[in-house]
Amino acid sequence: MMITLRKLPLAVAVAAGVMSAQAMAVDFHGYARSGIGWTGSGGEQQCFQTTGAQSKYRLGNECETYAELKLGQEVWKEGDKSFYFDTNVAYSVAQQNDWEATDPAFREANVQGKNLIEWLPGSTIWAGKRFYQRHDVHMIDFYYWDISGPGAGLENIDVGFGKLSLAATRSSEAGGSSSFASNNIYDYTNETANDVFDVRLAQMEINPGGTLELGVDYGRANLRDNYRLVDGASKDGWLFTAEHTQSVLKGFNKFVVQYATDSMTSQGKGLSQGSGVAFDNQKFAYNINNNGHMLRILDHGAISMGDNWDMMYVGMYQDINWDNDNGTKWWTVGIRPMYKWTPIMSTVMEIGYDNVESQRTGDKNNQYKITLAQQWQAGDSIWSRPAIRVFATYAKWDEKWGYDYNGDSKVNPNYGKAVPADFNGGSFGRGDSDEWTFGAQMEIWW
């Protein structure tokens, strides 16, 4: 009996420790991809992206190891009120060696407080670095609405017919503003802070199975005292977004229309750019001028077509029209059908086409890319991960223009601008060619 009594306090302590550990369990989430590939003409795997396009079709066309590791925890809860701490560290290396050192990117560190305001039930207050309500097309890894960065906001305010969210975030550009030093010399090393103010109204039910989201983003350069912007800089701009999401065929379809002005045109996703400068091959500074407008019309989704077939798809038209004539018209269309042989094995094909017209030259670059992959994945959905795939990719392109980065901006008036492929006897763009690659890759999110 004495032995039993002696063991009882220890058992209680262990049980309490286990319960405490469970109550304070850390959430571990993330994303990663890595693999190995070869090019048909020799050497390591090459990846194919059309000059002037802001993304590429990614299946069998990713040449790096990339990972995001997220740790988070609900650190306090009382009734329906809670605080959650979230972090995210990202890594990217060229996957060419065993030991590849890199500096990590600290992408998220924020606290989210839910139901803290009595008269706004269901809302969340947050502050810190955060991936904020990002909208993307997975199959081309294209983020068309993404203001992520250090910031603060109040989201998911129930207004009866939808959810209202308010946020402010920041992104900085190197060398964007200057101060007078001496002898008529200006120092362009100071970073320029770009602030973005975001308002969204989401989850508005406008038809059976369909919701509407509307958003307005205003971005502007925020200068320090006694500093001035680079001549010709794009100091502010607007982005307007309307997105309709429809439930269809056990999946979804998203139709998006976006219009942007000036500093919000180049990235086209809600972050301001153009108040900074770039540096040429000789480290001379030249301004980035994004004044103009952007129109984007996008349709994408993922659907199920019976027990054995799933498919992703995308179609997009984007027109960036700049006052300096260095804009582009880009349209892209692609599909990724998946046939499921078993609940964990499938064959996936991706077919994508890009066409980019230079505003300055009127010439066009185009590329089509086809990938066939045999895949083993954790489930029978096109979204199931982890997945291990072996693939073969073929790409053919014909490029009639490219960007001129020869020399420096002081002696080359075309530096950083679009020029014809044979401009001044040179060779710009990728020419007219084709190539194929093959390899294996894993991809996981959890």
From Swiss-Prot:
SUPFAM superfamilies: Porins. It is a multi-pass membrane protein. It comes from the Bacteria. The record marks 31, 66, 99, 252, 383, 445 as: Greasy slide, important in sugar transport. GO terms for molecular function: maltodextrin transmembrane transporter activity; maltose transporting porin activity. Keywords: Cell outer membrane, Ion transport, Membrane, Porin, Signal, Sugar transport, Transmembrane, Transmembrane beta strand, Transport. It catalyses: beta-maltose(in) = beta-maltose(out). Homotrimer formed of three 18-stranded antiparallel beta-barrels, containing three independent channels. HAMAP family: LamB. Involved in the transport of maltose and maltodextrins. This is Maltoporin.
